[in-house]
């Protein structure tokens, strides 16, 4: 049986953080190493995703070309993966001739098979920049929480957004308000595959249950998929001069193109007529649907390709029980971690801390505790005691007559065999936590045996040899089973044993062992916590400076008197105030404008009590286009001044009737 293992493509707009390592790369590497350890034919391919708006944005901000950003972060990401001992048979990039050619072949085949069609859509267009604006090129106010938001996502409340949902949208290049225009995009007829995708998911026995459940929920309401974008940087759509393929149709094709780079062997892994191969995709939870629904849909549309056997989806990682944020520097970068600790410690911690399919947290205190009291006090203790005692007493691993072993010796060796079989089964089910727990249990048994036998007190040399032989067998099994999880530390243990990576004890001369597992000190943890807080504070300072610039008007364009004259400002009086459900900031306000009453949604919770607002005369912009905030329509805007945390509504210094115009 052949195995193809793939990892989600890392996006080249930044280096890797611990969340990437936990959900995707470490488990995929453990799985690959283990299959290779068992002598099975397996290749591991991965790479970087090099196209899309975030990369062009970064390039524009830095005044460089997109390829410069791609080159920088492709190399940085590969260095991060190398530092974690993540091994690939090929690590490619989507901005390469073979990938672009393969992606265009896939697209053309989808079109030939009737799965691509044209459709008019509404999209923001900036007159000043003379360009259609992709989602990340538009920013504004989130309609749900009133926080600053991008066209695809609100960092404040975490909601996915469409650009046209933003309140007061503006082009990030020139700050002008874009208009909505109609344009033609290309769509993938995914809805036509609803029944076949459902059948595929339901009949994939190796697909994890949580992935099946998520995929089936999406398939129930399957829609066609916009697969083109009005940008220049990407894989050009065949026959189209002004659009490129959306990254989520072309990036997964990288799994095929990167395998192609290994030669004709790619056919034995990917083509439909090769029944003796399995495909396992390791990904993060946030892109489960893309791999369990969209990607299989593409493969079905092409025809002739094998479907993935398993989509192994790793849960989210929080940091100190808070959502990680790269913009706020609330994150631990891989580079910073490996400069301070062994990468094996991270591999161990992530796999033992929670099942892969569950969300989990990285806490510096928990990390220290698990490494010191579990890994070192159990596994480190047994391996060190066995090596030191055996080397000092015999100089080599003793070889004994197996028929002379006592029942307690045979029982422990039998436990080793049972553990090996159980670990094998668990790893093949992607259950890395329980597999690692079985190895820890075996080390506990070894510690108990060592302590109970008290080899330092045994006077009979033959019996002492039997005891230390038994301990050496346990040690060899631990090294063998742990090697996929902790390749660095087990390589050192194997070097001191002077053995090969298998389950046989040969009696070779031992090397004088040194301490392999060193404890994580309180000083180490204090330093890492301090570094995290410093980085976060630095990000907050930058954010504050940016906010001050916006508030001070540095980004505002000059307008003429005619433009100002188009704004309908009037005196209004607040009649009713109530909190908007599901919002921590918003009031629903009914205001009297003299000739009519208006409903206005405003983020004044925390600045004013509801009772304080009733009866107050305020200035209202009356000709704003209505917008929905948290599902409640707002038909205007109250004018207010703001400085840091202080918000003050604008009012009149003389009493005027409601409806009076402001000039």
Curated annotation (Swiss-Prot):
Zn(2+) binds at residues 142, 145, 154, 157. GO terms for cellular component: aminoacyl-tRNA synthetase multienzyme complex; cytosol. A motif ('KMSKS' region) lies at residues 323-327. ATP binds at residue 326. Its cofactor is Zn(2+). Keywords: Aminoacyl-tRNA synthetase, ATP-binding, Cytoplasm, Ligase, Metal-binding, Nucleotide-binding, Protein biosynthesis, RNA-binding, tRNA-binding, Zinc. Residues 563-663 form the tRNA-binding domain. Its EC number is 6.1.1.10. Binds 1 zinc ion per subunit. A motif ('HIGH' region) lies at residues 10-20. Its main location: cytoplasm. GO terms for molecular function: ATP binding; metal ion binding; methionine-tRNA ligase activity; tRNA binding. GO terms for biological process: methionyl-tRNA aminoacylation. It catalyses: tRNA(Met) + L-methionine + ATP = L-methionyl-tRNA(Met) + AMP + diphosphate. It is an enzyme of class 6 (ligase). It is found in: Cytoplasm. Belongs to the class-I aminoacyl-tRNA synthetase family. MetG type 1 subfamily. Homodimer. NCBIfam families: metG, metG_C_term, PRK00133.1. Is required not only for elongation of protein synthesis but also for the initiation of all mRNA translation through initiator tRNA(fMet) aminoacylation. This is Methionine--tRNA ligase. The gene is metG.
